[in-house]
Each structure stands twice: as C-alpha cells, then as structure tokens.
C-alpha cells in the first residue's frame, strides 16, 4: 500500500489485512523498521482525535514525528501543497498525514515518493475513521455479512458517511439512512434505504450517529439543538427500542443532547470511547503497511 487516499482504493483483502494487523497491535504486537522513519502530520482543519491518535500511533511504532504548523509554514507565502510535500520528501520524511478542507486535495500528489494518508478531505472521505469503525464493528460481531447498520444525521456533509456507506455495502452489510431529508442525497439510495429514525432503531445492529456539521452549512440551520434532538436524535426513549445486542457509534466530536442524549454517550451500548481507542491501533496498521512497502521497494532498488 503506497498511499491511503480513499476506501474505494482498498481491496477487501487489504481491508481484512489491516483489521487483523490492528487486532494484533491491540494484543501487544511490536513493529520494527530497518531504518529510521519520519512522519509529518499536516492538518489544515481542526482535529483532536485523528491528529492525536495518528501521533500516538507513530510514536508507538517508533516513527519520528516532524512538527508542522500550517500557519507558520511557507504555505502562508503562497507555496503550494505539492511543493511543501516535495520539501518534506527531500529532507527524508517517509509519510505525510494530511487533513484538508478541499475535496480530492490529493489529486496530482500521488506521483511524489512521499506516502500520503488522507486524514479527511472536506466532505469527501475519511478512510482511517472508516477503518477504525470497521475494526470496532468486527470486534463486536465478528462479521459484516448481514449486519443491519444505520447511518443517521448530517449525511450529506459527512466524509465518514461517504466512506462507510460504500465499504459496508461492499462487505455485505445492509444499510439504513436517517436524518433531515434536506441533508440527504438521493444517490445514497444506491447503498441503502432511507427511513425515519423511529423505524430504524428497532431494526439495526449498529446505530451510527453523525454530528451536525454547522461549519459546512451555507445558511442558517432551521433546527435548534432541542428540535433536532427531538426529531432526529437518539433520545433515551429511542435507545430503549434498540435490540439487546445493538451498539451505538459516533465518529466524534459529539454534540451531547443533539444527535445523541448525554446519558447515552458512555452507556453500556456505546462504543464511542472504544472507537477512539481503536483509532490508534488501526492507524498503526495503516502506517506499518505503508512503511513496510517503502522498505520493500527500497530493497528491490538495491538489486
């Protein structure tokens, strides 16, 4: 795996391998590399979990983390992302984890030797989040085949939803969507069925909630926090209708008492904190796969 840009670029075999490696890291597996390796985390949008867990993953792997601050970089002088990455490549950085507000920001960057991990591109995709979600689901159920999964909330503006709906259908899950119809695109019906939230909660094995992404909305939101929670959120009453072994997921950050009742965030059914923990292990697996391939290519070039 040279880069990780989207879930669609991964084969089912590659996905299964990453999930297995993440499980091994969670059980205490150690990674070693032939040479000193370097990573840079380039975040042009705010991030807590993705940024922090990638850095923890890098350090657990023994990878040196190169500091980067977009506001104090030469990009403020007009340097392009390509030329910034060319510089990182020239000084010996192996992999760049990038979050950017622009969808498909990575187009044209693949020809660089430095590896690129997409940490989220606008409303496009978020492959490492999708993989940690898959890891969390597989830990719970052991399979994706036949599972009923709901994706509920601000679907149109969610890169997590974009990644997850495509890969979950590919892996054999049955998908349901819910949330404000104006935040739903009819093209999503190729992946699943749209239903009101009150019909969904009784059906599903996984209730995956999404944050209302106010920063990506062009106008004034027509819902108050209270009205959104009442109409579309996972309230305490709705949660009582979930199947006994159903789990609740959320990519975070969570808006408590908006998409999910405050009391449910750390409830018995919730896997929200587990997702955060699993994020470190899946990102270790991603980085190891990329860095091991770099080592293999370098070895072939010496013959």
From Swiss-Prot:
It comes from the Bacteria. InterPro entries: Asp/Orn_carbamoyltranf_P-bd (IPR006132), Asp/Orn_carbamoylTrfase (IPR006130), Asp/Orn_carbamoylTrfase_sf (IPR036901), Asp_carbamoyltransf (IPR002082), Asp_carbamoyltransf_Asp/Orn-bd (IPR006131). PROSITE patterns: CARBAMOYLTRANSFERASE. SUPFAM superfamilies: Aspartate/ornithine carbamoyltransferase. It is an enzyme of class 2 (transferase). Its EC number is 2.1.3.2. Heterododecamer (2C3:3R2) of six catalytic PyrB chains organized as two trimers (C3), and six regulatory PyrI chains organized as three dimers (R2). This is Aspartate carbamoyltransferase catalytic subunit. It comes from Listeria monocytogenes serovar 1/2a (strain ATCC BAA-679 / EGD-e).
């Amino acid at each position: 795996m040279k880069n990780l840009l989207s879930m669609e670029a991964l084969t089912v075999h590659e996905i299964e391998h990453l999930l297995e490696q993440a499980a091994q890291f969670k059980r205490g597996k150690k990674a070693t590399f032939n040479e000193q390796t370097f990573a840079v985390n380039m975040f042009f949008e705010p991030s807590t979990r993705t940024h922090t867990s990638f850095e923890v993953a890098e350090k657990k792997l023994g990878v040196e983390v190169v500091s980067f601050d977009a506001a104090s970089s030469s990009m403020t002088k007009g340097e392009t992302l390509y030329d910034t990455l060319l510089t990182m490549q020239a000084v010996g950085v192996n992999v760049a984890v990038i979050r950017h507000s622009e969808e498909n920001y990575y187009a044209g960057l693949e020809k660089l030797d430095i590896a690129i991990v997409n940490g989220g591109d606008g409303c496009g995709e978020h492959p490492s989040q999708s993989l940690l979600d898959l890891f969390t689901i597989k830990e719970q159920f052991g399979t994706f085949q036949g599972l009923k999964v709901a994706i509920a909330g601000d679907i149109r503006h969610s890169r997590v939803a974009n990644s997850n709906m495509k890969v979950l259908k590919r892996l054999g899950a049955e998908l349901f969507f819910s949330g404000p119809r104006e935040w739903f695109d009819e093209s999503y019906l190729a992946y699943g069925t749209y239903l009101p939230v009150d019909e969904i909660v009784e059906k599903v094995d996984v209730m995956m909630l999404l944050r209302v992404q106010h920063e990506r909305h062009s106008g004034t939101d027509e819902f108050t926090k209270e009205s959104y929670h009442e109409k579309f959120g996972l309230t305490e009453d709705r949660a009582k209708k979930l199947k006994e072994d159903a789990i609740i997921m959320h990519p975070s950050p969570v808006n408590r008492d908006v998409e999910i009742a405050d009391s449910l965030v750390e409830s018995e059914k919730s896997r929200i904190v587990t997702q955060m923990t699993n994020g470190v292990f899946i990102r270790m697996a991603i980085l190891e796969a990329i860095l091991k391939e770099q080592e293999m290519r370098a070895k072939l070039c010496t013959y």
